[in-house]
């Protein structure tokens, strides 16, 4: 693959972080997913549980584009799915690695997005989801590029990597590896499974032809024990290393002491890949994972908030495309975990020590994780919050004042140009909301458990209402934040605020404004660039 191919892949570029149950502070399995795409409207999907007569057919549409791909036989029984978690706490996320372009099959019926949501509707465990998903592509053909899937339940987390076999060839080659319970892992648009233990059937599952097909295509010629799925089907290039693996590195760097050992791989100084999973230096909480989804390499050699590209107000974002040319040389910008083009983001918490309706929480937000608020969505919820739907016909190019996706984008796009000046106001409101939800969780779940002991439907209704209430209150608060920011920072000055209210003087008029001007470093560079043009004569 050339560098340009990797840039194209950034159109649909995502991040998954993983925490095994013995690596988390409360025994949860935890996985995260940011769906990053220019074109993806951030919404919370809901598929109610249902039963179907034998012979019912299901029409399949490509998740990315809405293109009709064909139809498959519907299952007799499907399970409730809200977002990317089902009623049995099974959660599936993904990142696209692309891989060898000649292996795409445009005649397949099952794309990666459909594979996720059909898989969730038909599976009670992660292992069952792997079987359902691989059986589907074997029967109906795999339409998409190479994918890494995170497939999790309250007890196990698996990474499954899959790629097609080429035009008109039904099925896919794939391998699934279980993440050890005491480890963390991640993937971010580059295949991460290298060698795997073909004899460990308990922790490694793979298609029978995963090695032989690579031999047949000329991708591999060694002995089986040396076979690397990633090297065979998604050869490493600069973009895969720097834009994709670097996000995994940032996670490992934060929670292990080995970050410095893996940095040369990210910088292209060695081809020795990072391990698929590592043991963290301390156990991670759900909040730790939420905060990691907001990462921009802060405090590392890849930090982008302090160089010239960060602009006047130290913004840790770079506009698309990531590459640019000056003269005949090509350059790039870093691609952190948190990015402006996210449609939605979640951190899934799955707990084996609680009944399924209570144990599974999808902490869900829309737009950029850095300025999102993660609200609790219980896996038993039978109704998605209206603000998380296509209310008023909202979509990626249709604005609605009642859509959380658009309200959060409205706020974040006010903040991006004046990031260091405005981000603290966002952080304060974000922290207040998330702390409130975190602190309320135990009490809410105790109430739900009491209801569940008497009447499951009452518990489901209670948690559905709580899911909707927290989302709506967050939406209302964020809309108020937006109006507050417009007033406070209007016209490049800052209004004075005390106890959350704009100050007035002794006669009731607005208090005098603060004029922040420009940062010292900018003014020095400004004078350097313009010389004596703006110098005041003596």
Identify the role of each PLM range.
Residues 116-122:
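Short, well-ordered beta-strand elements within core beta-sheets of diverse protein domains
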Residues 427-538:
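Histidine-centered catalytic/metal-binding microenvironments
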Residues 2-7:
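Short, small-residue-biased leader/transition segments that mark boundaries at the very start
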Residues 12-112, 132-284:
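A contiguous strand-loop segment
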Residues 215-365:
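Glycine-rich, aromatic-lined ligand/substrate-binding cores of catalytic
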Residues 313-449:
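Substrate-recognition/cap regions that form aromatic- and gly/pro-loop-enriched pockets
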């Amino acid at each position: 693959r050339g560098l340009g191919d990797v840039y194209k892949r950034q159109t649909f570029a995502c991040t998954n972080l993983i925490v095994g149950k013995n690596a988390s502070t409360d025994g949860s399995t935890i996985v995260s997913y940011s769906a990053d795409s220019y074109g993806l409207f951030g919404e919370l999907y809901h598929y109610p549980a249902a039963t179907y007569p034998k012979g019912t057919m299901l029409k399949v549409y490509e998740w990315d584009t809405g293109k009709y791909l064909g139809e498959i036989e519907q299952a007799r029984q499907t399970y409730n799915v809200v977002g990317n978690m089902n009623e049995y706490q099974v959660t599936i996320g993904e990142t696209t690695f692309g891989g060898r372009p000649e292996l795409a099959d445009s005649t397949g019926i099952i794309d990666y997005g459909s594979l996720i949501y059909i898989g969730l509707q038909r599976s009670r465990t992660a292992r069952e989801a792997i079987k359902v998903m691989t059986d589907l592509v074997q029967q109906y053909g795999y339409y998409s590029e190479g994918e890494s899937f995170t497939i999790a339940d309250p007890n196990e987390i698996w990474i499954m990597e899959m790629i097609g076999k080429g035009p008109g060839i039904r099925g896919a080659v794939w391998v699934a590896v279980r993440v050890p319970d005491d480890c963390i892992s991640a993937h971010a648009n580059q295949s991460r499974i290298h060698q795997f233990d073909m004899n460990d059937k308990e922790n490694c599952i793979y298609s029978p032809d995963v090695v032989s097909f690579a031999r047949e295509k000329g991708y591999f010629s060694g002995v089986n024990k040396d076979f690397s799925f990633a090297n065979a089907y998604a050869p490493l290039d600069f973009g895969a290393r720097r834009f994709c693996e670097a996000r995994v590195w940032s996670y490992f760097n934060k929670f292990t002491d080995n970050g410095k050992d893996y940095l040369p791989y990210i910088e292209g100084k060695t081809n020795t890949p990072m391990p698929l999973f590592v043991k963290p230096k301390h156990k991670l909480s759900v909040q730790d994972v939420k905060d990691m989804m907001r990462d921009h390499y802060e405090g590392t050699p890849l930090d982008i908030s302090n160089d010239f590209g960060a602009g006047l107000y130290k913004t840790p974002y770079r506009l698309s495309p990531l590459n640019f040319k000056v003269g005949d040389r090509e350059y790039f910008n870093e691609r952190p975990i948190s990015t402006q083009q996210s449609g939605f983001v979640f951190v899934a918490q799955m707990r084996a020590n609680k009944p399924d309706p209570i144990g599974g929480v999808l902490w869900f937000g829309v737009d950029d994780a850095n300025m999102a608020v993660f609200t609790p969505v219980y896996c038993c919820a039978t109704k998605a919050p209206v603000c998380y739907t296509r209310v008023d016909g909202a979509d990626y190019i249709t604005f609605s004042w009642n859509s959380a996706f658009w309200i959060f984008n409205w706020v974040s796009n006010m903040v991006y140009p004046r990031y260091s000046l405005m981000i603290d106001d966002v952080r304060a409101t974000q922290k207040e909301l998330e702390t409130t939800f975190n602190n309320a969780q135990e009490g809410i779940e105790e109430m739900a458990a009491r209801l569940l002991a008497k009447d499951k439907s009452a518990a489901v209704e209670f948690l559905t209402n709580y899911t909707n209430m927290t989302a709506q209150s967050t939406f209302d608060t964020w809309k108020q934040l937006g109006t507050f920011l417009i007033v406070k920072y209007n016209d490049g000055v800052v209004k004075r605020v005390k106890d959350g209210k704009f100050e007035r003087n002794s006669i009731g008029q607005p208090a005098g404004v603060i004029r922040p001007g420009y940062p010292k470093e900018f003014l020095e560079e400004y004078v350097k660039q313009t010389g004596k043009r703006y110098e005041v004569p003596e």
